[in-house]
Amino acid sequence: MLARRQHDLTVCMEQVHKPHNVSAVIRTADAVGIHHVHAVWPGDRMRTMVSSSAGSNSWVKVITHRTIGDAVSTVKAQGMQVLATNLSDNAIDFREIDYTLPTCILMGQEKTGITREALALADQDIIIPMLGMVQSLNVSVASALILYEAQRQRQIAGMYQ
């Protein structure tokens, strides 16, 4: 089981503040074999809430950062591409990304999404195509869709052996 962990695939939550969303992202990360996620919280309050609310914390380490700049520089130092979930003219369908490369998926805050600073630091904007009237999914649902596409590609490539 531990040999199947994906050390070069992670999620970074930028000020995702609802404990049930944080917990769901962490549980999904564990389900696809991610052993650590990153979270940006400027204050100490959310760190306490997430540590008490996320049951998967015993399997998935949450690495906290005070700024998005710190978080992105940490994952880029590990050679990861940083993908921002953001509806923009430059965004591409999340299924067109090569997730067999070292990857960090940046998920924004529930209400306002990803900050301008984070978007400037990201390598690529990605979108989940929406055919209905709504323009976004819940952060935990969106992260699950993207992570399972990453898992699918990595399984085909034999990265879970």
Regions found by a protein language model. Name each.
Residues 1-161:
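Post-transcriptional modification and biogenesis factors for structured RNAs
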